[in-house]
Amino acid sequence: MNRVSIRRAFWAALLLVVPALSLHSGLLQEPPRAFMDAAGPGWRSLGESDFAPVNGNPDTWTWKDGLLRCSGKPIGVMRTREKFTNFEMVIEWRHLKAAGNSGVFVWVPDEALAQLKPDVLPDFGIEVQMLDHGYREQYEKESGKKGDWFTTQGDIFPVGKSKLKPFPPLSPDGSRSFPRKNLTLGFGEWNHYYVRAINGELRLWVNGEEVSGGNGADPRTGYLCLESEGSPVEFKNFRVRELP
């Protein structure tokens, strides 16, 4: 084979190898898929029979036509009947009034719920917050304090005795993971939350994009609790998938 033939063979081989390397590199860099559509094997819906009352009134939580409605009164929670460790979760929610406040508590142990009185929230768990945009104005007006220690975009933070190392950006005191993007919609509009919880790490996607999270949670096994906190809110399409 002469030099021209060798050179041509080299460039032909290179044209085949480079795209293959690029494809391989792309596959390595692609992040794990988040199953935000809640479709596929293992996903299941959570309905009325999957929840147990904790410290609400009989009419605090009502189910009708696929919707779960919370009156917001008294303050408290409702829990799942089973505990979860590693899982994916999707839930849609909307506040029915401006300045509404609610959330999902993750990894809540038995001791935090035993004999919990009305108008009291658990002192354990990681909260995935659901606030309406009007909440900050209401808080500042009623308290006379600056509402810079929270956002209305999907904060994640440990409650009471639970521990979590929040991902940045952080709240001024470092206790909360503030969202990287502002994606939540105002009262009357549905928001979609996707949560992935694995080995003490929690990540939140709001309306399709990852925004906040944390790791090093303790405890990292427990109930999922929906929060009633003074204002009416609705939930739908609550689905979970347990992970190894």
Feature locations, PLM:
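Bacterial N-terminal signal peptides that target proteins for export
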Residues: 2-13
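Carbohydrate-interacting regions of secretory-pathway proteins
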Residues: 26-244
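Bacterial N-terminal signal peptides
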Residues: 12-22
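Serine residues within intrinsically disordered or low-complexity segments
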Residues: 5, 22-25
